[in-house]
UniProtKB/Swiss-Prot annotation:
Keywords: Chloroplast, Plastid, Ribonucleoprotein, Ribosomal protein, RNA-binding, rRNA-binding. Signal peptide: none annotated. GO terms for biological process: translation. Belongs to the universal ribosomal protein uS19 family. This is Small ribosomal subunit protein uS19c.
Amino acid sequence: MTRSIKKGPFVADHLLKKIENLNLKKEKKIIITWSRASTIVPTMIGHTIAVHNGQEHLPIYITDRMVGHKLGEFAPTRTFRGHAKNDKKSRR
């Protein structure tokens, strides 16, 4: 079930304040955040946000096509190492 429209998108307060301050100063700095659940809103376009993936912060440049998605969608938490090349036991 999707979020109710009357509630509006969730954006962490500290993240929104940082972005609004940078917009007023017209600065472009990397913003570090752990808030993967925050929704990308139009005021974030053009900023670089470093999202935590469990080990490190991955810098993500926000574009207009990302609006409405969550920050966590662009910072994968698991690394896929690939399938085993010569595993003959599993073929039986």
